[in-house]
């Protein structure tokens, strides 16, 4: 919109013409009427771009601190263990990008090529993109309103040159915010396989996961399943399991049974996970015999099977 004020929510936003920043704008009445809204041409551009990506997976969480970014990183690592599988990891946690640190890519920068932004590669078959690569320092704060965040996500989806990719893993911020709405809107025409939702066993975390599940239902986003992280601690010496965060209401298992949502698995606590993330290395390499590694591998296999079954179903619908 010409003459739009700073903080403009955009003509296609639910707050168009009604937000606080709209007061005094010459376009306020036009936006409020809905006449100024028009289909975003970026949606079609992104659909074309995503034709080279076979599967798209969102990783969500109701709360911060439940291990969502750690899971996203290790999901990407696990999928990429097959050298013939091309994997991309996109970090859209705009205000809290931790993927560069976890993947050992701090200090890397984005490079522009003739076909778009080039991802930063961990391995030949594992590329990463994050707003963290655009910051001069990892300690810099990103203080952006919704429209600017949405523009950044649009640019990531439209302008990053992933090439032919089997899996695109998208790490999102906690909760249900502008970033989630934007990525679902922009990828709607391109098809999203589904979402993996992270939680811990406590009811205070599960309460927000129920909101996340409600969000998925409202925006028609398929749910691959729930992962219960920090599910227990297995002593490396005696092999006995202790509940560090005991589930007060039955944990993720009881919630999934009540809501008829698949429980993909439970990942126990392992001190090596945090150490691996701090060093920017794969936990699977650091602790291949850990019960947490076995839990991760089982969960990743279930996600892979879900995506393959969705692809087979879609191909059957398309075939004559």
UniProtKB/Swiss-Prot annotation:
Q: Where does [4Fe-4S] cluster 2 bind?
A: 235, 238
Q: Which residues bind [4Fe-4S] cluster 1?
A: 8, 22, 25, 31
Q: Which cofactor does it need?
A: [4Fe-4S] cluster
Q: Which GO terms describe its biological process?
A: cell projection organization; centrosome localization; intracellular iron ion homeostasis; iron-sulfur cluster assembly; negative regulation of centrosome duplication; protein localization to cell cortex; regulation of cell growth
Q: Which residues carry this modification: N-acetylmethionine?
A: 1
Q: Which SUPFAM superfamilies match?
A: P-loop containing nucleoside triphosphate hydrolases (SSF52540)
Q: Which UniProt keywords apply?
A: 4Fe-4S, Acetylation, ATP-binding, Cell projection, Cilium, Cilium biogenesis/degradation, Cytoplasm, Cytoskeleton, Iron, Iron-sulfur, Metal-binding, Nucleotide-binding, Nucleus, Phosphoprotein
Q: What does this protein do?
A: Component of the cytosolic iron-sulfur (Fe/S) protein assembly (CIA) machinery. Required for maturation of extramitochondrial Fe-S proteins. The NUBP1-NUBP2 heterotetramer forms a Fe-S scaffold complex, mediating the de novo assembly of an Fe-S cluster and its transfer to target apoproteins. Implicated in the regulation of centrosome duplication. Negatively regulates cilium formation and structure.
The protein, known as: Cytosolic Fe-S cluster assembly factor NUBP1
Q: Which organism is it from?
A: Rattus norvegicus
